[in-house]
Design a protein with these regions (language model features):
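A short, Lys/Arg-rich alpha-helix, primarily the initiator
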Residues: 1-25, 29, 67
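Alpha-helical residues within the helix-turn-helix
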Residues: 28, 32, 62
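Recognition helix of helix-turn-helix/homeodomain-like DNA-binding domains
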Residues: 33-52
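Short amphipathic recognition helices of helix-turn-helix/homeodomain-type DNA-binding modules
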Residues: 71-76
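DNA major-groove recognition helix of helix-turn-helix/homeodomain DNA-binding modules
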Residues: 54-69
Length: 76
């Protein structure tokens, strides 16, 4: 599967929805917990530009109740 910025953005938005959050709630939580900007447009632009840093992805996952795990392909 070719990964594009649209699939990345949509994948992250889908995870937000599956965790029963709105984008605004995520932005508020990230602002309170980690000092992110409280601007929804900044967060949305970050997703569109694919400029989310790995540290920010970890913080986003934490707020959503997930963890990011690295595993080799083919492992269960």
């Amino acid at each position: 599967m070719k990964i594009t910025n649209q699939t990345t953005k949509n994948a992250i938005k889908a995870q937000i929805m599956m965790a029963n959050f709105t984008m605004a709630e995520v932005v508020d939580a990230l602002s309170m917990e980690y000092g992110w900007s409280d601007s929804l447009s900044n967060f949305s632009s970050k997703l569109s530009r694919e400029s989310l840093r790995y540290k920010e992805a970890l913080e986003l996952a934490e707020v959503l109740g997930y963890e990011i795990v690295w595993k080799k392909k083919g492992e269960n």
